[in-house]
Amino acid sequence: MSRKDNEVSLARSIFNILSGTFCSRITGIFREIAMATYFGADPIVAAFWLGFRTVFFLRKILGGLILEQAFIPHFEFLRAQSLDRAAFFFRRFSRLIKGSTIIFTLLIEAVLWVVLQYVEEGTYDMILLTMILLPCGIFLMMYNVNGALLHCENKFFGVGLAPVVVNIIWIFFVIAARHSDPRERIIGLSVALVIGFFFEWLITVPGVWKFLLEAKSPPQEHDSVRALLAPLSLGILTSSIFQLNLLSDICLARYVHEIGPLYLMYSLKIYQLPIHLFGFGVFTVLLPAISRCVQREDHERGLKLMKFVLTLTMSVMIIMTAGLLLLALPGVRVLYEHGLFPQSAVYAIVRVLRGYGASIIPMALAPLVSVLFYAQRQYAVPLFIGIGTALANIVLSLVLGRWVLKDVSGISYATSITAWVQLYFLWYYSSKRLPMYSKLLWESIRRSIKVMGTTMLACMITLGLNILTQTTYVIFLNPLTPLAWPLSSITAQAIAFLSESCIFLAFLFGFAKLLRVEDLINLASFEYWRGQRGLLQRQHVMQDTQN
Protein backbone atom coordinates (compact mmCIF):
# COMPACT_ATOMS: atom_id res chain seq x y z
CA MET A 1 0.00 0.00 0.00
CA SER A 2 1.34 3.39 -0.97
CA ARG A 3 2.33 5.37 2.07
CA LYS A 4 0.45 8.38 0.74
CA ASP A 5 -2.87 6.56 1.19
CA ASN A 6 -3.59 7.83 4.70
CA GLU A 7 -5.53 10.47 6.58
CA VAL A 8 -2.64 12.94 6.46
CA SER A 9 -2.39 12.92 2.67
CA LEU A 10 -6.17 13.07 2.27
CA ALA A 11 -6.48 16.09 4.56
CA ARG A 12 -3.68 17.94 2.80
CA SER A 13 -5.01 17.18 -0.67
CA ILE A 14 -8.52 18.20 0.35
CA PHE A 15 -7.15 21.48 1.70
CA ASN A 16 -5.33 22.17 -1.58
CA ILE A 17 -8.28 21.45 -3.83
CA LEU A 18 -10.65 23.43 -1.62
CA SER A 19 -8.32 26.43 -1.60
CA GLY A 20 -8.25 26.73 -5.38
CA THR A 21 -11.95 26.06 -5.81
CA PHE A 22 -12.84 28.50 -3.04
CA CYS A 23 -11.17 31.37 -4.90
CA SER A 24 -13.19 30.64 -8.03
CA ARG A 25 -16.40 30.40 -6.00
CA ILE A 26 -15.79 33.77 -4.36
CA THR A 27 -15.46 35.45 -7.76
CA GLY A 28 -18.57 33.52 -8.78
CA ILE A 29 -20.48 35.18 -5.95
CA PHE A 30 -19.45 38.63 -7.19
CA ARG A 31 -20.50 37.52 -10.67
CA GLU A 32 -23.97 36.67 -9.36
CA ILE A 33 -24.22 40.03 -7.62
CA ALA A 34 -23.29 41.84 -10.83
CA MET A 35 -25.81 39.83 -12.89
CA ALA A 36 -28.65 40.45 -10.45
CA THR A 37 -27.82 44.16 -10.07
CA TYR A 38 -27.44 45.15 -13.73
CA PHE A 39 -29.43 42.51 -15.64
CA GLY A 40 -32.29 41.96 -13.18
CA ALA A 41 -34.97 39.26 -13.42
CA ASP A 42 -35.96 39.53 -17.08
CA PRO A 43 -37.26 36.76 -19.41
CA ILE A 44 -34.20 37.27 -21.67
CA VAL A 45 -31.98 36.56 -18.63
CA ALA A 46 -33.95 33.39 -17.94
CA ALA A 47 -33.41 32.40 -21.60
CA PHE A 48 -29.68 33.02 -21.17
CA TRP A 49 -29.50 30.75 -18.11
CA LEU A 50 -31.42 28.04 -19.94
CA GLY A 51 -28.96 28.24 -22.84
CA PHE A 52 -25.99 28.32 -20.48
CA ARG A 53 -27.24 25.20 -18.69
CA THR A 54 -27.71 23.44 -22.03
CA VAL A 55 -24.05 24.10 -22.87
CA PHE A 56 -22.96 22.70 -19.51
CA PHE A 57 -25.00 19.61 -20.32
CA LEU A 58 -22.20 18.49 -22.68
CA ARG A 59 -19.48 19.22 -20.15
CA LYS A 60 -21.29 17.49 -17.30
CA ILE A 61 -21.91 14.38 -19.40
CA LEU A 62 -18.38 13.93 -20.75
CA GLY A 63 -16.25 15.96 -18.38
CA GLY A 64 -15.59 16.56 -14.72
CA LEU A 65 -15.84 13.63 -12.35
CA ILE A 66 -17.00 11.17 -15.02
CA LEU A 67 -13.86 11.70 -17.08
CA GLU A 68 -11.58 11.55 -14.05
CA GLN A 69 -13.05 8.37 -12.61
CA ALA A 70 -12.37 6.61 -15.93
CA PHE A 71 -9.05 8.24 -16.86
CA ILE A 72 -7.08 8.57 -13.60
CA PRO A 73 -6.91 4.88 -12.50
CA HIS A 74 -5.86 3.70 -15.97
CA PHE A 75 -3.36 6.53 -16.42
CA GLU A 76 -1.71 5.79 -13.06
CA PHE A 77 -1.51 2.10 -13.99
CA LEU A 78 0.37 2.98 -17.19
CA ARG A 79 2.65 5.51 -15.51
CA ALA A 80 3.72 2.91 -12.95
CA GLN A 81 5.08 0.88 -15.87
CA SER A 82 6.44 3.63 -18.10
CA LEU A 83 6.24 7.43 -18.12
CA ASP A 84 6.48 7.47 -21.92
CA ARG A 85 3.64 4.99 -22.18
CA ALA A 86 1.39 7.13 -19.97
CA ALA A 87 2.28 10.34 -21.83
CA PHE A 88 1.51 8.94 -25.27
CA PHE A 89 -1.73 7.46 -23.96
CA PHE A 90 -2.73 10.90 -22.71
CA ARG A 91 -2.05 12.39 -26.16
CA ARG A 92 -4.35 9.82 -27.76
CA PHE A 93 -7.03 10.29 -25.16
CA SER A 94 -6.87 14.08 -25.45
CA ARG A 95 -7.22 13.96 -29.24
CA LEU A 96 -10.20 11.61 -28.96
CA ILE A 97 -12.08 13.82 -26.50
CA LYS A 98 -11.25 16.99 -28.43
CA GLY A 99 -12.36 15.58 -31.78
CA SER A 100 -15.55 14.05 -30.37
CA THR A 101 -16.50 17.31 -28.67
CA ILE A 102 -15.98 19.38 -31.83
CA ILE A 103 -18.05 16.99 -33.97
CA PHE A 104 -20.81 16.83 -31.35
CA THR A 105 -20.89 20.62 -31.08
CA LEU A 106 -21.11 21.09 -34.86
CA LEU A 107 -23.99 18.62 -35.07
CA ILE A 108 -25.93 20.43 -32.36
CA GLU A 109 -25.24 23.79 -34.02
CA ALA A 110 -26.62 22.46 -37.32
CA VAL A 111 -29.78 21.11 -35.70
CA LEU A 112 -30.40 24.32 -33.75
CA TRP A 113 -29.86 26.43 -36.88
CA VAL A 114 -32.62 24.50 -38.65
CA VAL A 115 -34.95 24.77 -35.64
CA LEU A 116 -34.21 28.49 -35.37
CA GLN A 117 -35.98 29.15 -38.68
CA TYR A 118 -39.35 27.95 -37.37
CA VAL A 119 -39.65 29.11 -33.75
CA GLU A 120 -41.40 32.07 -32.14
CA GLU A 121 -39.69 35.14 -30.67
CA GLY A 122 -39.32 33.95 -27.06
CA THR A 123 -37.93 30.57 -28.03
CA TYR A 124 -35.81 32.20 -30.76
CA ASP A 125 -33.70 34.08 -28.20
CA MET A 126 -33.13 30.96 -26.13
CA ILE A 127 -31.93 28.93 -29.13
CA LEU A 128 -29.79 31.78 -30.47
CA LEU A 129 -28.04 32.21 -27.11
CA THR A 130 -27.47 28.46 -26.91
CA MET A 131 -25.84 28.47 -30.36
CA ILE A 132 -23.51 31.31 -29.37
CA LEU A 133 -22.54 29.60 -26.10
CA LEU A 134 -21.99 26.11 -27.54
CA PRO A 135 -18.26 26.63 -28.37
CA CYS A 136 -17.72 27.10 -24.63
CA GLY A 137 -18.29 23.36 -24.32
CA ILE A 138 -15.26 22.61 -26.49
CA PHE A 139 -12.90 24.63 -24.29
CA LEU A 140 -14.54 23.24 -21.14
CA MET A 141 -13.85 19.68 -22.27
CA MET A 142 -10.24 20.49 -23.16
CA TYR A 143 -9.86 22.12 -19.74
CA ASN A 144 -11.28 19.01 -18.03
CA VAL A 145 -8.93 16.66 -19.88
CA ASN A 146 -5.93 18.78 -18.90
CA GLY A 147 -7.28 19.06 -15.37
CA ALA A 148 -7.46 15.28 -15.00
CA LEU A 149 -3.78 15.02 -15.90
CA LEU A 150 -2.81 17.84 -13.55
CA HIS A 151 -4.70 16.14 -10.71
CA CYS A 152 -2.50 13.10 -11.29
CA GLU A 153 0.43 15.49 -10.88
CA ASN A 154 -1.06 16.67 -7.54
CA LYS A 155 -1.70 20.15 -8.94
CA PHE A 156 -5.11 20.75 -7.41
CA PHE A 157 -4.87 24.45 -6.63
CA GLY A 158 -4.17 25.73 -10.14
CA VAL A 159 -6.94 23.68 -11.76
CA GLY A 160 -9.45 24.94 -9.22
CA LEU A 161 -8.28 28.53 -9.66
CA ALA A 162 -8.57 28.67 -13.49
CA PRO A 163 -12.35 29.46 -13.58
CA VAL A 164 -11.54 32.79 -11.90
CA VAL A 165 -10.58 34.10 -15.36
CA VAL A 166 -14.07 33.38 -16.70
CA ASN A 167 -15.72 35.09 -13.74
CA ILE A 168 -13.54 38.20 -14.06
CA ILE A 169 -14.37 38.55 -17.78
CA TRP A 170 -18.04 37.94 -16.96
CA ILE A 171 -18.13 40.62 -14.26
CA PHE A 172 -16.22 43.14 -16.37
CA PHE A 173 -18.60 42.76 -19.32
CA VAL A 174 -21.75 42.97 -17.18
CA ILE A 175 -20.59 46.24 -15.63
CA ALA A 176 -19.34 47.66 -18.94
CA ALA A 177 -22.59 46.84 -20.81
CA ARG A 178 -25.01 47.80 -18.03
CA HIS A 179 -26.52 50.71 -20.02
CA SER A 180 -26.93 48.78 -23.29
CA ASP A 181 -30.09 47.26 -24.71
CA PRO A 182 -31.03 44.14 -22.64
CA ARG A 183 -31.06 41.80 -25.63
CA GLU A 184 -27.83 43.15 -27.12
CA ARG A 185 -25.91 42.92 -23.84
CA ILE A 186 -27.02 39.32 -23.24
CA ILE A 187 -25.80 38.37 -26.72
CA GLY A 188 -22.54 40.23 -26.09
CA LEU A 189 -22.11 38.45 -22.76
CA SER A 190 -22.49 35.09 -24.50
CA VAL A 191 -19.68 35.98 -26.92
CA ALA A 192 -17.48 37.21 -24.04
CA LEU A 193 -17.96 33.90 -22.22
CA VAL A 194 -16.62 31.96 -25.20
CA ILE A 195 -13.43 34.05 -24.94
CA GLY A 196 -13.35 33.51 -21.17
CA PHE A 197 -13.54 29.73 -21.40
CA PHE A 198 -10.78 29.77 -24.02
CA PHE A 199 -8.46 31.49 -21.52
CA GLU A 200 -9.55 29.06 -18.77
CA TRP A 201 -8.29 26.16 -20.90
CA LEU A 202 -5.16 28.08 -21.91
CA ILE A 203 -4.08 28.38 -18.25
CA THR A 204 -3.80 24.58 -17.95
CA VAL A 205 -1.69 24.16 -21.10
CA PRO A 206 1.78 24.97 -19.62
CA GLY A 207 1.44 22.30 -16.92
CA VAL A 208 0.42 19.71 -19.50
CA TRP A 209 3.30 20.64 -21.81
CA LYS A 210 5.74 20.35 -18.92
CA PHE A 211 4.62 16.78 -18.28
CA LEU A 212 4.60 15.77 -21.95
CA LEU A 213 8.13 17.10 -22.47
CA GLU A 214 9.34 14.54 -19.93
CA ALA A 215 8.35 11.78 -22.35
CA LYS A 216 11.37 11.77 -24.65
CA SER A 217 10.82 8.65 -26.73
CA PRO A 218 7.82 6.75 -28.12
CA PRO A 219 6.91 3.67 -26.05
CA GLN A 220 7.43 0.20 -27.44
CA GLU A 221 3.83 -0.68 -26.59
CA HIS A 222 0.99 1.63 -27.63
CA ASP A 223 -2.12 1.52 -25.45
CA SER A 224 -5.55 1.94 -26.96
CA VAL A 225 -8.17 4.23 -25.48
CA ARG A 226 -10.65 1.38 -25.82
CA ALA A 227 -9.83 0.40 -22.24
CA LEU A 228 -11.73 3.49 -21.12
CA LEU A 229 -14.79 2.98 -23.31
CA ALA A 230 -16.69 0.80 -20.83
CA PRO A 231 -16.24 3.00 -17.72
CA LEU A 232 -16.73 6.16 -19.80
CA SER A 233 -19.91 4.84 -21.42
CA LEU A 234 -21.54 3.87 -18.13
CA GLY A 235 -20.31 7.06 -16.49
CA ILE A 236 -21.71 9.13 -19.35
CA LEU A 237 -25.07 7.39 -19.02
CA THR A 238 -25.12 8.10 -15.28
CA SER A 239 -24.21 11.74 -15.81
CA SER A 240 -26.73 12.06 -18.66
CA ILE A 241 -29.51 10.92 -16.39
CA PHE A 242 -28.54 13.52 -13.79
CA GLN A 243 -28.29 16.33 -16.35
CA LEU A 244 -31.57 15.39 -18.03
CA ASN A 245 -33.14 15.42 -14.61
CA LEU A 246 -31.77 18.92 -14.03
CA LEU A 247 -33.00 20.12 -17.42
CA SER A 248 -36.42 18.64 -16.71
CA ASP A 249 -36.47 20.58 -13.43
CA ILE A 250 -35.75 23.79 -15.33
CA CYS A 251 -38.49 23.04 -17.87
CA LEU A 252 -40.93 22.19 -15.09
CA ALA A 253 -39.99 25.46 -13.39
CA ARG A 254 -40.89 27.29 -16.62
CA TYR A 255 -44.16 25.35 -16.69
CA VAL A 256 -44.96 26.40 -13.12
CA HIS A 257 -43.89 30.06 -13.55
CA GLU A 258 -42.63 32.16 -16.45
CA ILE A 259 -39.50 33.22 -14.53
CA GLY A 260 -39.26 29.88 -12.72
CA PRO A 261 -35.97 28.86 -14.40
CA LEU A 262 -34.33 32.02 -13.06
CA TYR A 263 -35.48 31.26 -9.50
CA LEU A 264 -34.24 27.71 -9.83
CA MET A 265 -30.86 28.62 -11.35
CA TYR A 266 -30.04 31.33 -8.80
CA SER A 267 -30.96 29.03 -5.90
CA LEU A 268 -28.95 26.17 -7.44
CA LYS A 269 -25.87 28.41 -7.53
CA ILE A 270 -26.06 28.81 -3.74
CA TYR A 271 -27.23 25.34 -2.76
CA GLN A 272 -24.63 23.54 -4.88
CA LEU A 273 -21.76 25.60 -3.46
CA PRO A 274 -21.04 23.36 -0.43
CA ILE A 275 -21.60 20.21 -2.50
CA HIS A 276 -19.31 21.21 -5.35
CA LEU A 277 -16.77 22.96 -3.17
CA PHE A 278 -16.43 20.27 -0.51
CA GLY A 279 -18.28 17.07 -1.45
CA PHE A 280 -16.90 16.69 -4.98
CA GLY A 281 -13.49 17.88 -3.83
CA VAL A 282 -13.36 15.06 -1.30
CA PHE A 283 -14.51 12.62 -4.01
CA THR A 284 -11.68 13.69 -6.33
CA VAL A 285 -9.11 13.02 -3.61
CA LEU A 286 -10.75 9.87 -2.22
CA LEU A 287 -11.31 7.87 -5.44
CA PRO A 288 -7.68 6.82 -6.15
CA ALA A 289 -6.95 5.91 -2.52
CA ILE A 290 -10.08 3.82 -1.96
CA SER A 291 -9.61 2.14 -5.35
CA ARG A 292 -6.19 0.87 -4.27
CA CYS A 293 -7.53 -0.29 -0.91
CA VAL A 294 -10.43 -2.25 -2.40
CA GLN A 295 -8.44 -3.77 -5.25
CA ARG A 296 -5.64 -4.90 -2.90
CA GLU A 297 -8.20 -6.02 -0.31
CA ASP A 298 -6.64 -3.78 2.32
CA HIS A 299 -10.03 -3.19 3.90
CA GLU A 300 -8.59 -2.10 7.23
CA ARG A 301 -7.00 0.92 5.57
CA GLY A 302 -10.08 1.45 3.40
CA LEU A 303 -12.34 1.52 6.46
CA LYS A 304 -10.13 4.12 8.13
CA LEU A 305 -10.12 6.36 5.06
CA MET A 306 -13.88 6.04 4.50
CA LYS A 307 -14.60 6.69 8.16
CA PHE A 308 -12.39 9.78 8.07
CA VAL A 309 -14.05 11.33 5.01
CA LEU A 310 -17.61 10.36 5.99
CA THR A 311 -17.23 11.88 9.45
CA LEU A 312 -15.57 14.99 8.07
CA THR A 313 -18.15 15.45 5.31
CA MET A 314 -21.07 14.81 7.63
CA SER A 315 -19.89 17.42 10.13
CA VAL A 316 -19.32 20.07 7.45
CA MET A 317 -22.63 19.41 5.69
CA ILE A 318 -24.66 19.55 8.91
CA ILE A 319 -23.29 23.05 9.51
CA MET A 320 -23.92 24.00 5.88
CA THR A 321 -27.51 22.76 6.05
CA ALA A 322 -28.25 24.69 9.22
CA GLY A 323 -26.54 27.78 7.86
CA LEU A 324 -28.50 27.59 4.62
CA LEU A 325 -31.85 27.33 6.38
CA LEU A 326 -31.00 30.07 8.87
CA LEU A 327 -29.20 32.52 6.61
CA ALA A 328 -31.04 31.99 3.32
CA LEU A 329 -32.92 35.31 3.34
CA PRO A 330 -30.06 37.63 4.41
CA GLY A 331 -27.69 35.78 2.09
CA VAL A 332 -29.95 36.07 -0.96
CA ARG A 333 -30.50 39.75 -0.17
CA VAL A 334 -26.76 40.40 -0.26
CA LEU A 335 -26.35 38.52 -3.53
CA TYR A 336 -29.39 39.56 -5.53
CA GLU A 337 -31.58 42.32 -4.04
CA HIS A 338 -29.97 45.19 -5.94
CA GLY A 339 -30.84 47.41 -8.87
CA LEU A 340 -33.52 45.87 -11.09
CA PHE A 341 -33.89 42.69 -9.04
CA PRO A 342 -37.34 42.73 -7.31
CA GLN A 343 -38.03 41.65 -3.73
CA SER A 344 -40.62 39.14 -4.95
CA ALA A 345 -37.87 37.29 -6.82
CA VAL A 346 -35.69 37.29 -3.69
CA TYR A 347 -38.48 35.68 -1.65
CA ALA A 348 -39.11 33.11 -4.40
CA ILE A 349 -35.41 32.15 -4.47
CA VAL A 350 -35.38 31.79 -0.66
CA ARG A 351 -38.37 29.43 -0.77
CA VAL A 352 -36.66 27.29 -3.41
CA LEU A 353 -33.37 27.40 -1.52
CA ARG A 354 -34.91 26.19 1.72
CA GLY A 355 -36.47 23.31 -0.16
CA TYR A 356 -33.03 22.28 -1.38
CA GLY A 357 -31.57 22.52 2.14
CA ALA A 358 -32.49 18.98 3.16
CA SER A 359 -30.61 17.51 0.18
CA ILE A 360 -27.16 18.91 1.01
CA ILE A 361 -26.13 15.98 3.22
CA PRO A 362 -27.22 13.11 0.91
CA MET A 363 -25.93 14.93 -2.20
CA ALA A 364 -22.48 15.24 -0.60
CA LEU A 365 -22.41 11.66 0.71
CA ALA A 366 -23.71 9.91 -2.42
CA PRO A 367 -20.49 10.41 -4.49
CA LEU A 368 -18.41 9.12 -1.57
CA VAL A 369 -20.53 5.99 -1.32
CA SER A 370 -20.32 5.54 -5.09
CA VAL A 371 -16.54 5.29 -4.73
CA LEU A 372 -17.06 1.78 -3.36
CA PHE A 373 -18.63 0.78 -6.70
CA TYR A 374 -16.12 2.59 -8.90
CA ALA A 375 -13.21 1.07 -6.98
CA GLN A 376 -14.49 -2.36 -8.07
CA ARG A 377 -15.12 -1.06 -11.62
CA GLN A 378 -18.84 -1.65 -11.17
CA TYR A 379 -20.74 1.22 -12.76
CA ALA A 380 -24.08 -0.44 -13.51
CA VAL A 381 -25.57 -0.25 -10.00
CA PRO A 382 -25.12 3.55 -9.60
CA LEU A 383 -26.52 3.93 -13.13
CA PHE A 384 -29.74 2.02 -12.42
CA ILE A 385 -30.19 3.75 -9.07
CA GLY A 386 -29.68 7.10 -10.81
CA ILE A 387 -32.28 6.27 -13.46
CA GLY A 388 -34.81 5.25 -10.83
CA THR A 389 -34.34 8.31 -8.65
CA ALA A 390 -34.35 10.64 -11.69
CA LEU A 391 -37.70 9.31 -12.86
CA ALA A 392 -39.07 9.54 -9.33
CA ASN A 393 -37.81 13.11 -9.05
CA ILE A 394 -39.50 14.17 -12.31
CA VAL A 395 -42.85 12.75 -11.21
CA LEU A 396 -42.56 14.12 -7.68
CA SER A 397 -41.46 17.56 -8.96
CA LEU A 398 -44.52 17.72 -11.19
CA VAL A 399 -46.83 16.68 -8.36
CA LEU A 400 -45.39 19.04 -5.74
CA GLY A 401 -44.60 21.95 -8.05
CA ARG A 402 -47.73 22.04 -10.16
CA TRP A 403 -50.48 20.59 -8.00
CA VAL A 404 -49.58 20.42 -4.29
CA LEU A 405 -47.48 23.50 -3.48
CA LYS A 406 -48.18 25.21 -6.83
CA ASP A 407 -44.79 26.88 -6.58
CA VAL A 408 -41.26 26.41 -7.96
CA SER A 409 -40.15 25.42 -4.45
CA GLY A 410 -42.02 22.14 -4.91
CA ILE A 411 -39.28 21.08 -7.35
CA SER A 412 -36.59 21.63 -4.72
CA TYR A 413 -38.51 19.68 -2.07
CA ALA A 414 -38.85 16.80 -4.54
CA THR A 415 -35.09 16.86 -5.10
CA SER A 416 -34.44 16.63 -1.35
CA ILE A 417 -36.74 13.65 -0.93
CA THR A 418 -35.27 11.68 -3.84
CA ALA A 419 -31.69 12.53 -2.76
CA TRP A 420 -32.19 10.66 0.51
CA VAL A 421 -33.78 7.74 -1.37
CA GLN A 422 -30.78 7.58 -3.70
CA LEU A 423 -28.31 7.59 -0.81
CA TYR A 424 -30.20 4.78 0.90
CA PHE A 425 -30.12 2.49 -2.14
CA LEU A 426 -26.48 3.28 -2.92
CA TRP A 427 -25.42 2.31 0.58
CA TYR A 428 -27.71 -0.73 0.68
CA TYR A 429 -26.24 -2.26 -2.47
CA SER A 430 -22.66 -1.26 -1.65
CA SER A 431 -23.06 -3.06 1.68
CA LYS A 432 -24.18 -6.17 -0.16
CA ARG A 433 -21.03 -6.16 -2.29
CA LEU A 434 -18.63 -5.11 0.49
CA PRO A 435 -20.14 -6.35 3.78
CA MET A 436 -17.19 -5.09 5.83
CA TYR A 437 -18.32 -1.51 5.04
CA SER A 438 -21.99 -2.14 5.86
CA LYS A 439 -22.03 -0.44 9.28
CA LEU A 440 -19.77 2.46 8.42
CA LEU A 441 -22.43 4.96 7.28
CA TRP A 442 -24.65 4.21 10.27
CA GLU A 443 -21.69 4.64 12.62
CA SER A 444 -20.86 8.00 11.00
CA ILE A 445 -24.48 9.15 11.33
CA ARG A 446 -24.58 8.03 14.96
CA ARG A 447 -21.33 9.86 15.69
CA SER A 448 -22.71 13.01 14.05
CA ILE A 449 -25.70 13.15 16.43
CA LYS A 450 -23.64 15.23 18.85
CA VAL A 451 -22.66 17.57 16.02
CA MET A 452 -26.28 17.82 14.94
CA GLY A 453 -27.50 18.54 18.47
CA THR A 454 -24.89 21.24 19.01
CA THR A 455 -25.74 22.84 15.66
CA MET A 456 -29.47 22.83 16.41
CA LEU A 457 -28.78 24.40 19.81
CA ALA A 458 -26.79 27.19 18.17
CA CYS A 459 -29.63 27.75 15.67
CA MET A 460 -32.27 27.98 18.39
CA ILE A 461 -30.22 30.45 20.42
CA THR A 462 -29.69 32.58 17.30
CA LEU A 463 -33.42 32.53 16.53
CA GLY A 464 -34.17 33.38 20.14
CA LEU A 465 -31.94 36.44 19.97
CA ASN A 466 -33.75 37.58 16.82
CA ILE A 467 -37.08 37.28 18.60
CA LEU A 468 -35.84 39.09 21.73
CA THR A 469 -34.26 41.92 19.73
CA GLN A 470 -37.28 42.12 17.37
CA THR A 471 -35.15 41.56 14.27
CA THR A 472 -36.99 38.55 12.85
CA TYR A 473 -37.41 40.46 9.58
CA VAL A 474 -33.73 39.70 8.92
CA ILE A 475 -34.30 35.93 8.60
CA PHE A 476 -38.09 35.37 8.32
CA LEU A 477 -40.12 35.79 5.13
CA ASN A 478 -43.09 36.56 7.40
CA PRO A 479 -41.44 38.47 10.28
CA LEU A 480 -42.99 38.81 13.73
CA THR A 481 -42.11 42.51 13.87
CA PRO A 482 -42.03 45.23 11.18
CA LEU A 483 -38.85 46.43 9.52
CA ALA A 484 -36.95 48.70 11.94
CA TRP A 485 -34.50 50.04 9.36
CA PRO A 486 -34.29 49.64 5.57
CA LEU A 487 -32.27 46.78 4.11
CA SER A 488 -32.11 48.22 0.61
CA SER A 489 -28.41 49.15 0.58
CA ILE A 490 -25.74 46.50 0.14
CA THR A 491 -24.00 47.80 3.28
CA ALA A 492 -27.07 47.21 5.46
CA GLN A 493 -27.63 43.81 3.85
CA ALA A 494 -24.02 42.78 4.40
CA ILE A 495 -24.11 43.91 8.05
CA ALA A 496 -27.31 41.91 8.64
CA PHE A 497 -25.86 38.79 6.99
CA LEU A 498 -22.49 39.00 8.74
CA SER A 499 -24.12 39.68 12.12
CA GLU A 500 -26.37 36.63 11.86
CA SER A 501 -23.48 34.49 10.62
CA CYS A 502 -21.12 35.56 13.40
CA ILE A 503 -23.73 35.03 16.09
CA PHE A 504 -24.54 31.54 14.79
CA LEU A 505 -20.88 30.51 14.41
CA ALA A 506 -19.92 31.98 17.79
CA PHE A 507 -22.59 29.95 19.57
CA LEU A 508 -21.82 26.87 17.47
CA PHE A 509 -18.11 26.67 18.22
CA GLY A 510 -18.61 28.02 21.74
CA PHE A 511 -20.97 25.15 22.56
CA ALA A 512 -18.64 22.75 20.72
CA LYS A 513 -15.77 23.71 23.00
CA LEU A 514 -17.97 23.68 26.09
CA LEU A 515 -19.46 20.27 25.27
CA ARG A 516 -16.13 18.96 23.87
CA VAL A 517 -17.56 18.07 20.45
CA GLU A 518 -14.30 17.03 18.82
CA ASP A 519 -15.59 16.83 15.24
CA LEU A 520 -16.64 20.50 15.40
CA ILE A 521 -13.54 21.73 17.22
CA ASN A 522 -11.29 20.11 14.64
CA LEU A 523 -12.93 22.02 11.79
CA ALA A 524 -11.55 25.27 13.18
CA SER A 525 -8.04 23.82 13.61
CA PHE A 526 -5.50 24.52 10.85
CA GLU A 527 -3.34 21.65 12.13
CA TYR A 528 -6.27 19.28 11.63
CA TRP A 529 -6.53 20.27 7.96
CA ARG A 530 -2.80 19.65 7.65
CA GLY A 531 -3.52 16.04 8.61
CA GLN A 532 -2.39 16.18 12.24
CA ARG A 533 -4.28 15.08 15.31
CA GLY A 534 -7.33 16.99 16.46
CA LEU A 535 -7.20 19.34 19.42
CA LEU A 536 -8.81 17.00 21.94
CA GLN A 537 -6.69 14.07 20.76
CA ARG A 538 -3.52 16.09 21.36
CA GLN A 539 -4.75 17.03 24.84
CA HIS A 540 -5.34 13.36 25.67
CA VAL A 541 -1.86 12.44 24.43
CA MET A 542 -0.28 15.22 26.53
CA GLN A 543 -2.20 14.10 29.62
CA ASP A 544 -1.14 10.48 29.10
CA THR A 545 2.49 11.59 28.68
CA GLN A 546 2.39 13.63 31.90
CA ASN A 547 0.85 10.73 33.79
Curated annotation (Swiss-Prot):
Subcellular location: Cell inner membrane
Location (main, coarse): membrane
Regions crossing the membrane: 32-52, 55-75, 96-116, 122-142, 156-176, 186-206, 227-247, 270-290, 308-328, 355-375, 380-400, 408-428, 457-477, 495-515
GO cellular component, one term: plasma membrane
Keywords for the protein's UniProt record, in alphabetical order: Cell inner membrane, Cell membrane, Cell shape, Cell wall biogenesis/degradation, Membrane, Peptidoglycan synthesis, Transmembrane, Transmembrane helix, Transport
Domain of life according to the entry: Bacteria
Membrane topology reported for the UniProt record: Multi-pass membrane protein
Gene Ontology biological process terms, A to Z: cell wall organization; peptidoglycan biosynthetic process; regulation of cell shape
Family, as annotated: Belongs to the MurJ/MviN family.
Protein function: Involved in peptidoglycan biosynthesis. Transports lipid-linked peptidoglycan precursors from the inner to the outer leaflet of the cytoplasmic membrane.
Protein name: Probable lipid II flippase MurJ
Gene: murJ
